[in-house]
Amino acid sequence: MTVKGETNFWKTLKTSLEGGEYIVSRLESYVTPGFPDCLIYNKVTGFFTIELKVINSSNKVTVSPFQIAWNMRHSLAGAKSYILVGGLPNHHVKLFHGCKTKELGQSTVDQVPGLYEGRLVDLDLSKIVSNSETP
């Protein structure tokens, strides 16, 4: 994953979500290692977090031990925590529940069950977040 790739992915996500339904903030936290990249608010779902990742040439993402710890702790406690992976073929994305962070660090993206795979423009986050439970 390159910083430029993730930055471009962030810009695409923000553009896709802006339009009144979502308030999207990108966070860079050096105080709390592992804190996800995005804090998002929707009046239906409330707050939730998304960690952005871009696949590498091996069809994997790089996940730090801090990111694994943060997402596992919070998602297993019931927090709305997700990983959104970009860079898939056909400009698709894949959304994972935060409790899948450790698996994502150990496997290829296609080996880990996700909540959604398809075009970013078709991703209905409010529906998925409202209906998802910790697997």
Positions of the model-derived regions?
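Acidic-basic catalytic patches of nuclease active cores, encompassing PD-(D/E)XK
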Residues: 1-29, 43, 93
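Anion (oxyanion) recognition and catalysis
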Residues: 18, 72-76
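Beta-rich catalytic cores
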Residues: 34
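Conserved catalytic cores of phosphodiester-cleaving nucleases, focusing on short active-site segments
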Residues: 38-40, 46-57
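Active-site-adjacent loop/helix micro-motif of nuclease/hydrolase catalytic cores
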Residues: 56-68
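Sequence/structural signature of beta-propeller domains
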Residues: 61, 96-107
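Nucleic-acid nuclease catalytic cores
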Residues: 75-101
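Charged phosphate-binding loop/patch that engages nucleotide di/tri-phosphates or the phosphate backbone
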Residues: 111-135
